[in-house]
Amino acid sequence: MQWRISNIVTEATSGSVLFGGVDTARYTGDLISVDVYPTDNSRRVTSFTVAWTSLSATSSSGTDVLTSSDYAEAAILDSGTTITLLPDKIAEIVFEELGAQVSNELGAVIVPCDLEKNTGTLDYTFGGIGGPTIKVQMSQLVLPITTETGEVPRFTNGQTVCQLGIQPAGDLPVLFGDTFLRSAYVVYDLENNKIALAQTDFNATSSNIVSFASKGAPIPSATQASNALAVTQTATGNPKIGGATATGAGTATYNPTATGLTAASGFASNKSAAGHGPQPFAWSKVVIGAVSVALMGMGSGFFAFL
């Protein structure tokens, strides 16, 4: 069975599913396929695990490559999950780039909501040299936070508080949820254990469907990545994040621009200078909106965009 899912825009009430074909009008650039890898030594494919091989941060002030040249990490593509879980060390660097802060009171990573207006991107590459690169805009990563009374919390300098849709994975699998997948046009070839990715065209209005030639045929209109860097999925566990609440007092801070990161100042361009340093804020009964994630089993094939 071959199929793809695309959630056209963040505010969309529905995505779309196409069985047995590719809609070449719904993406930009090249559609490039990579291998899907089995879990551990079982040789069974129980999740959509691919080789994630590079991450860069690009802003108006430059580009930083955040991974080594031989980097390869098993990553699950899962549309049943809202957020993206990155290896802890890489997540820390991303937070430095974006000026994000881990809030223990909320159990969330927080940023000023104005970050969604920033034109910078996080650029993910898969399958090694020649593999697909997906650019994720800040607007896809910033999620709302509201109080139990429906109010939007603010920092003391007046800026509203939002959640960043990226968290450290800890002992959980590295997982790319909706905050990544909204930016990707994805084709799932379950017959050949391949996944093809391209950049989503958010402005697409037409359709051009190309069918698979036959059962077991390669993904139409797609080229194959080198897949020189193979991976094995060994991590287990299910993220369960949702309905998070916090009581008591906390401190919200804007991180100063990180040293040694060229792109960081570009991501900081929308921040008020008054935001630097400690910004006291009472996190009384704050809840994270639009975040309810649970990693689902994938043995029978399913997908549902939130």
What label would you give each PLM region?
Residues 125-297, 301-306:
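Aspartic protease catalytic domain
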Residues 1-204, 208:
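Active-site or ligand-binding cleft "flap/edge" segments
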